[in-house]
Structures are given as structure tokens and as C-alpha cells.
């Protein structure tokens, strides 16, 4: 960005991360570019194991962009690139050969981890659920089994078990167990979103990313989804982007507040909502801007 007010040096920040030994995903010093236009500035994000981390901030602040870096979805678009590091259990999943070159140009002293070139494995280990439900035009069963068939060689009996278990974990099994052959598109919006969660869970990810998953859902469906996420964090780490401050306060353990492509404040959710340290976080949480 060209306006100097948008740079890290001009923004008051407060970062209180969890203990390093408890992290299973960590973004470090990320910059992100759409062509020559920079949209993220030296952003770091620690994700603690078996916790829910929320990202909040005004529209366009970089929340969804950060989420898409974490499992390399941006790599589908050649004009987009990230510079920095993303560590999954200590292994760098961001630094492929192209990124390594950019890091060295920036002056970072890093080596190449082979995992960075295996995007398929990365996306199996870090699942993603989008804002709008995206069921595939196939049966409920095949929706859940799709990723498993793509990544693993499983028997039909094993697939049956995985599909049932994933639907149970997504709190959807009781609603669909008698119509697994019906189209996933026949489900309600809330059910479709939980189907997408089940599809992501089927490949046994370590981390689940969710980009405003309840924005199009009614209050009842939102409550069901939140209950599901609270149960799921027993088995994996969750990062959720939300514009709903009450939702972040209800379900997250840690919250990061972003503004103009910067991580302004990061700490425990209770601490951020009760005693925000930065002026911009206080103003956002009290509704002075959005």
C-alpha cells in the first residue's frame, strides 16, 4: 500500500501468543501480493492445538486472504503470491521453490522443506470450509467420500465407515442417514454447510479453516454449526473468520483483530473483548467503525 498510515510502523499493535510448544500451525511474517499490489504486511498468526482461533476485523482487512494462505488456495492463481513462512507441526508448508527465491530476495535465511511442494498433502491436512455452502452435484455419500477417494485407496467397507463417522462428527448423520444416495444439493443451507464440514473431516485434517461459515445461515443452523465446532476442537485445531463479534466471543479461545492488512491485536478472546490494548481494537469492538 502506498499510504504510509497503512504500514506496520504506523499502527499500534499488541500480540500475546500462546506458548510455542502448544502450536500446530503458525504463520510467520507473511506478506501477500495480488500482482504488484501488497495486501498483507508482516502478519503472524499462532494457532494452538485443539483450540478455536477467530479472525475479526472490518471488510477488506485481510482475514480471508490470510485464511487462503494457510492451505495454499491462493496458489491456484499465478498472479497471487505470499512471502513468509507457514509451519505445520514445525514443517514449512509455504516455502516451495518460487517462494524460497522471494524469501532470499527479502533477505530471509531459510532452507527448503519438501512439504512445501506437496500442495495436495497440505490441503488434506488443512481443510477449508467456505462462506457459501459448496456441495458437489453428487450424492450425500459421494460428497463426503470425494476427498478420501482422491487421496487414499480405501475399500467400500472402509469408505462406509469414514462417511458415517464424518457425518456423525459434523452432527448431520441423524438427518441424512436414510438418504445418503440423494443429492447433496437437496439439503437445506445449514445442512449443506455441515455436509461441507463432513467432507473436510473425512480426510482427517489436523486443522480446519472456516471462512464466515454461518453468514448465510439462520440462527438455528448457526447454533448447530457452533455446537459442532465446539465438539470438533477436541480432535483438531480450528481457525474461523467471522464478522459476528458475538460468535467470536462465544466459541473462540483466541482472537486476532486485523486492520488494513496488519495483525493489530492477538490474544485470548476473553482478554481481547474485556480489555483490548489498542485503540483500533477498542473502536472496532465498541462499534465506532466496521
From Swiss-Prot:
ATP binds at residues 57-64. GO terms for cellular component: plasma membrane. InterPro entries: AAA+_ATPase, ABC_transporter-like_ATP-bd, ABC_transporter-like_CS, P-loop_NTPase, PstB-like. GO terms for molecular function: ATP binding; ATP hydrolysis activity; ATPase-coupled phosphate ion transmembrane transporter activity. It is found in: Cell inner membrane. The complex is composed of two ATP-binding proteins (PstB), two transmembrane proteins (PstC and PstA) and a solute-binding protein (PstS). SUPFAM superfamilies: P-loop containing nucleoside triphosphate hydrolases (SSF52540). It is an enzyme of class 7 (translocase). Part of the ABC transporter complex PstSACB involved in phosphate import. Responsible for energy coupling to the transport system. The gene is pstB. It catalyses: phosphate(out) + ATP + H2O = ADP + 2 phosphate(in) + H(+). Keywords: ATP-binding, Cell inner membrane, Cell membrane, Membrane, Nucleotide-binding, Phosphate transport, Translocase, Transport. This is Phosphate import ATP-binding protein PstB. GO terms for biological process: phosphate ion transmembrane transport. Its main location: membrane. NCBIfam families: 3a0107s01c2.
